Design a protein with these regions (language model features):
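Periplasmic alpha-helical coiled-coil/stalk elements that build and connect Gram-negative outer-membrane
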Residues: 3-115, 227, 231, 272-274
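Amphipathic alpha-helical coiled-coil segments
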Residues: 3-23, 34, 41, 77, ...
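Transmembrane beta-barrel architecture of outer-membrane proteins
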Residues: 10, 55, 147, 175-177, ...
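Metallo-beta-lactamase
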Residues: 70, 121, 283
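Structural signature of outer-membrane beta-barrel channels/translocons
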Residues: 73, 142-144, 183-187, 286
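Acidic, glycine-rich loop-and-beta core segments that form the ion-binding/anion-interacting portion
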Residues: 92, 100-103, 108-153, 157
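Small/polar, glycine/serine/threonine/aspartate-rich low-complexity segments that form flexible
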Residues: 95-109, 138, 151-188, 195, ...
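Acidic, low-complexity, intrinsically disordered peripheral segments
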Residues: 279-319
């Protein structure tokens, strides 16, 4: 169940990321198209060179290629989501704006590691396997030991025709017995010893499997925890970079209008802005998905965690 929740969430965010990429590429195409038209007008009136027009045309052609790739990627991601949820043409709801990303609570990696070592399904399964192996060893070792059986019986004998001493007299005899039997095992050709050795080997293997499971879970939990922390830092940095990129683009546009910047400066600033927007959107999805993966690694992922993610989505549009 936990694996299914993560896979569906992954496919859901993949579609949203692909939609964002297409949206940003189309917005960049519009901006480059306007810059291309401006470069052509300036060339016609003699205020710019043909190089400006050619640079803008080359950038426009590149964005067209990126748009085609983004459209195809979105189709592929939607097909993957449809196949996973069993719905044709599923329409994921985007994140609300602004996006209040959840914090890790508690923000202590040791807490999550200890929780994982105790509750992760793989660890619990390995612990149960070890308990079974120990019971099998104890069972095999009893082959060397004497056993005591409690025996009890009750017998009723009816004589409708009487007995030799009392012919013709109907009689019934009740006999009850109880006793204890002591069984001493004899030499059985090393069968018991071999069985004990086998169960001890299986017990040792089960102990090693449990320790391996605990180490793997601890490593996966730490990786997930630090991944979410790093992702949250990246989101903050990219939010600042987005604002800076927008300011840089505005400054380059103004500089181009007054003749202190050239066309390629504006085109590069546009590319930087929309690339930052794409990176920021992807980083947000990575944080949300990483939060689910952290809880999965700790063995605590449930529907309530998915519902908390759902609360961050924008209200669904009414038909």
């Amino acid at each position: 169940t936990q694996d299914l929740l993560v896979r569906v969430s992954q496919a859901y965010f993949d579609v949203l990321a692909a939609q964002d990429t297409l949206t940003f590429v189309q917005a960049q195409k519009t901006a480059v198209s306007e810059q291309l038209a401006s470069a052509k007008r300036n060339f016609e009136v003699g205020t710019s060179t043909v190089t400006d027009s050619r640079e803008a045309q080359a950038r426009y052609d590149l964005v067209i290629a990126q748009e085609i790739a983004a459209e195809n990627d979105l189709r592929v991601k939607k097909l993957a989501l449809d196949q996973l949820v069993g719905v044709t043409n599923a329409q994921p709801v985007p994140l609300a704006q602004p996006v209040p990303l959840p914090r890790i609570e508690p923000a202590n990696v040791d807490y999550w590691v200890e929780t994982a070592r105790a509750q992760q399904p793989g660890v619990r399964q390995a612990a149960i396997a070890l308990d079974i192996a120990r019971l099998e060893t104890q069972k095999a070792e009893t082959g060397h030991r004497p056993t005591v059986d409690l025996q009890a019986g009750y017998n009723i004998t009816r004589n409708p025709n009487g007995t030799l001493t009392a012919p013709g007299v109907n009689s019934r005899t009740n006999v009850a017995s109880i006793g204890v039997a002591l069984n001493l095992p004899l030499f059985a050709g090393f069968a018991v010893q071999n069985r004990v050795k086998e169960t001890l080997a299986l017990e040792t293997k089960a102990e090693a499997d449990l320790e391996t499971a605990r180490r793997n879970v601890a490593q996966a939990t730490r990786s997930a925890f630090f991944g979410v922390q790093s992702g949250q830092g990246q989101v903050q940095a990219l939010e600042a970079a987005e604002a800076s990129s927008q300011t840089a683009l505005d400054a380059n546009k103004l500089g181009y209008q007054v003749g202190v910047r050239i066309n390629i400066d504006v085109l590069n600033a546009q590319s930087q802005l929309y690339q930052t927007k794409r990176d920021l959107a992807q980083a947000r999805y990575n944080v949300l998905l990483g939060t689910l993966k952290l809880r999965q690694a700790a063995g605590t992922l449930g529907l309530e965690d998915v519902q908390r993610i759902n609360s961050l989505l924008a209200p669904a549009k009414q038909p």
